[in-house]
Amino acid sequence: MSLSIDVTSLPSISSSIFKNESSSTTSTLSGKSIGRSEQYISPDAEAFNKYMLSKSPEDIGPSDSASNDPLTSFSIRSNAVKTNADAGVSMDSSTQSRPSSNVGCDQVDFSLTKGINVSANLDSCISISTDHKKEKSKKDKSRKHYPRIEADSDSEDYVLDDSDSDDGKCKNCKYKKKYFALRMRMKQVAMQLIEDL
C-alpha cells in the first residue's frame, strides 16, 4: 500500500526528506570536490551561465539548475549567499538524488510495514419461525367442537317485537324459534373465538 502526497507547496518538507548528512566545506558533484563559493556565490550572472554551460548534460543533476530564467538563477544565487559553507549546510551533496521523472512535483511514498487486515466475515443467522399452520389447525380443531345448528321448520307465524328486530324492519318473522337459536349459537361461537385469540 503506497500513499502519494504532493508536497510542491511545502519546500521545507521536500528538502528535508531528500537531505542527508553532508560535508561541511565541499560538495561532491560528478566526482569533483568543488567549494560552495566556487559553485554558487558569483556576483556576475555570466559566470553562472558559463559554469552551467561548461558541464556536460550527463553531469547536470537535480541539484543543479538548468534553467535559463534569470529569476530562477537569481533566487538560487541569493539562497546560496545566505548559506554559510563553514556551517556544514549543503544543499547539493545528497547521495539520494531527487526523482527526475516528475518535474515540478515532489512525491513522497510512504510504505506501510504493518498490513491492515480487515475481517469481513459476516456470521448472520436468520431463523424465521411461523406458526401459521399450527394456528390454522388449532382453529380447525376448535371449530370442530362447535355443534351444528339444525333448523326445524315451523309452520306457525311469529311476530317479533321492535326490541328484537333490527330497527323494527322484521315485523313478520316466520322462523322466530330458529332465529333465536341461531343467534344464541353465533354468540357462543363469537365468545369462543375471542377466548381463543
UniProtKB/Swiss-Prot annotation:
GO terms for molecular function: ATP hydrolysis activity; magnesium ion binding; nucleotide binding; RNA binding. Keywords: Glycoprotein, Host cytoplasm, Magnesium, Metal-binding, Nucleotide-binding, Phosphoprotein, RNA-binding. The modification Phosphoserine is found at residues 67, 153, 155, 163, 165. Pfam families: Rota_NS26. Residues 17-30 have a biased composition (Low complexity). Its main location: host cell. GO terms for biological process: viral genome replication. O-glycosylated. Mg(2+) binds at residue 92. The keyword Glycoprotein applies. One of its GO terms (cellular component) is host cell cytoplasm. Residues 17-37, 53-72, 129-166 are annotated as: Disordered. Residues 188-197 are annotated as: Homodimerization and interaction with NSP6. Magnesium is required for ATPase activity. InterPro entries: Rotavirus_A/C_NSP5. HAMAP family: ROTA_NSP5. Belongs to the rotavirus NSP5 family. Plays an essential role in the viral genome replication. Participates, together with NSP2, in the formation of viral factories (viroplasms), which are large inclusions in the host cytoplasm where replication intermediates are assembled and viral RNA replication takes place. Orchestrates the recruitment of viroplasmic proteins such as capsid proteins to these factories. Participates in the selective exclusion of host proteins from stress granules (SG) and P bodies (PB). Also participates in the sequestration of these remodeled organelles in viral factories. This is Non-structural protein 5. It comes from Rotavirus A (strain RVA/Pig/Mexico/YM/1983/G11P9[7]) (RV-A).
